[in-house]
Structures are given as C-alpha cells and as structure tokens.
A protein has these predicted regions:
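Soluble FAD-dependent oxygen oxidases
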Residues: 1-190
C-alpha cells in the first residue's frame, strides 16, 4: 500500500528560463545545490525545443528553445522560508526570465503540461537514471537538446531531469513497487 502526504491545496511555484549559452552554468549550479535541498522542495529541469505560452513566459520567448528550471515549495506557500527558497533557486545562473506564484497543486501543477501533452496524443518517453549529474553528463544533455531532439525541425520534444529526492528516497526499493530509488537523477526524453 502507498502512503499519501497531505499538503496544499496550494503551493509556491517558481520557474527560470535559460538560453543555450547560459544553460550549462545553470545546470551545474542545479546539480551542486539539489542534493542538499530539504524534503519539501522539488526542483526539476525541462529542456524544451519550443517553449509554450505559459503564464510566466514573456511573449518574445514563446516558441524558442529554452531550458526551464522549475521549483516547488511543498509547504506553507506564504511562509518566509518558502518565499526565500524559491527566490534563491530562481537566482541560479543568468536566466532570460523568471516567474513565481502561488498556484493550486491539483489544477495548477498537475495540469501544467496538459496543453503540450493533450489526451489522445501518442507520446513516447524513454528514461535513464544517473547517480551523478557530472559536467560530462550536463554537456551531453545540453548538446543533445541543442543539436538533436528535433533541433532545426518542427518536431517538438522535451528532455527532462527530475531529481528524485525527498521522502521518495527515504523508502527502500524493496519496500515498494517503485524502483530505482537509489538513483538521484532521472532523465526523461519525450
């Protein structure tokens, strides 16, 4: 059986957007900071070939290739600690744009990508697991995102890195049907 954790119904969300030439430095900071974050913080990467028109994306950046680092404070969204944590994570590197807001988890965060991945679309996803997000791994991911993954075509794709931290890592792999808990970095290509 699974145990759910009560929080919300709202959460503090933040996103920072980076062009290719700033992405590597931002991802290196992300890799250095993420392992030390507390359990109530989620911080992930979405490398988009064409940034969708999300509420925090300036109009001139819609449709351009951008790396997005997005964070979630999964505790009291109005707490000073949460506000400062999100601001700290948005200050990583030199973002082209940032935005933060208090949003509903269920109808906000869980539906965040519905427009990009609508019902009926035949999505194909592959996943890899890394124990370390090294400089070489970051270079390979950015190169693949910038030069592959539909670059120069109309193909829309996403390369994502989800850090598996928090309470998910506190449960032994043999105690759950959820495998690969010993791997901090999950890389998804969609």
């Amino acid at each position: 059986s699974f145990q759910a954790y009560d929080f919300g119904p709202t959460m503090r969300f933040g996103a920072a957007l980076y062009h290719e030439d700033e992405a590597r430095a931002a991802l290196r900071e992300y890799a250095a900071i993420y392992p030390s974050l507390p359990n109530n913080v989620g911080w992930h990467v979405a490398m988009k070939r064409a940034m969708p028109a999300l509420p925090f994306v300036p109009e001139e950046l819609v449709g351009t290739p951008l790396v997005m680092l997005f964070c979630m404070w999964l505790d009291d969204p109005e707490s000073q600690e949460g506000i400062e944590m999100v601001e700290r994570l948005l200050a990583v590197g030199e973002p082209a744009a940032t935005g933060s807001a208090v949003i509903p988890f269920g109808l906000g965060m869980q539906r965040f990508l519905d427009a990009e991945f609508p019902d009926g679309l035949r999505n194909y996803t592959k996943e890899a697991h890394l124990k370390e997000l090294s400089e070489g791994a970051i270079d390979a991911l950015v190169d693949f995102w910038a030069e592959g993954l539909g670059a120069g075509t109309s193909i829309e794709g996403e390369l994502a890195s989800d850090g598996l931290g928090g309470v998910a890592r506190d449960v032994a792999e043999i105690e759950s049907a959820f495998a690969n808990r010993d791997t901090l970095w999950w890389i998804n290509c969609a």
